[in-house]
């Protein structure tokens, strides 16, 4: 829901400025939920991946196994976030009954920051896909239908303070996800 022009992680109070239809529909959903007056927790997240379905991690595993060379965008910064970490956080909040009286918007991503390029290099290294050469490129060199924010870091102070969450680092979670993928294959 943000435009990506910030230089510090976005707080929940930062003014939204979606760059594409996806961001606009996410913001519209938040606004519709808030307008109902219901007691809701709205969680914003970014750069989700898991061992299921299509996502960046699984795409990089496939490409680095199949190709000798790929280019990956290096000028977009965010936090790779394992969907299992988000699910566990939501489960602990709901199961513990910690949400009563704490309605509102919260940010949740794993800890740390990377570019898509850095994340791709880490995925390939951890998976042993050393034969694929990964090179950085600019967003402008990799056109997509939807404009993407250059900076997607979310400030997690509020969710940590409100719910006492311990948030894992993205690298630990990536390794865990890769282990689960390997085990399931």
Region roles according to the model:
Residues 1-43, 48:
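Catalytic helix-loop patch of NAD(P)-dependent Rossmann-fold dehydrogenases
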Residues 22-26, 53, 79, 116, ...:
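Conserved donor sugar-nucleotide recognition element shared by glycan-biosynthetic enzymes
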Residues 20, 78-81, 114, 154, ...:
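Residue-level signal for the nucleotide or nucleotide-sugar donor/cofactor binding architecture
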Residues 31-78, 84-92:
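NAD(P)-dependent short-chain dehydrogenase/reductase
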Residues 170-185:
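Amphipathic terminal alpha-helices
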Residues 140-162:
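A hydrophobic C-terminal alpha-helical subdomain
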Residues 56-58, 83, 87, 116-120, ...:
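A general structural signal for well-ordered alpha-helical segments in protein cores
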Residues 89, 96-146:
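Mid/C-terminal beta-alpha module of Rossmann-like enzyme folds, strongest
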């Amino acid at each position: 829901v943000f435009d990506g022009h910030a230089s510090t992680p976005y707080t929940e109070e930062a003014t939204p400025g979606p760059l594409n239809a996806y961001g606009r529909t996410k913001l519209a959903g938040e606004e519709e939920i808030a307008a109902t007056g219901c007691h809701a927790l709205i969680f914003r997240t970014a750069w989700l991946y898991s061992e299921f379905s299509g996502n960046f991690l699984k795409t990089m595993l496939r490409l680095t196994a199949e190709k000798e060379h790929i280019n990956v965008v290096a000028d977009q910064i965010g936090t790779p976030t394992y969907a299992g970490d988000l699910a566990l956080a939501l489960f602990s909040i709901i199961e513990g009954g910690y949400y009563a009286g704490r309605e509102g918007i919260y940010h949740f991503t794993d800890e740390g920051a990377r570019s898509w390029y850095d994340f791709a290099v880490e995925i390939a290294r951890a998976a042993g896909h050393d034969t694929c050469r990964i090179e950085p490129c600019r967003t402008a060199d990799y056109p997509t239908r939807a404009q993407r924010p250059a900076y997607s870091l979310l400030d997690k102070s509020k969710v940590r303070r409100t719910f006492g969450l311990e948030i894992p680092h993205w690298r630990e979670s990536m390794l865990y996800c890769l282990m689960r993928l390997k085990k399931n294959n």
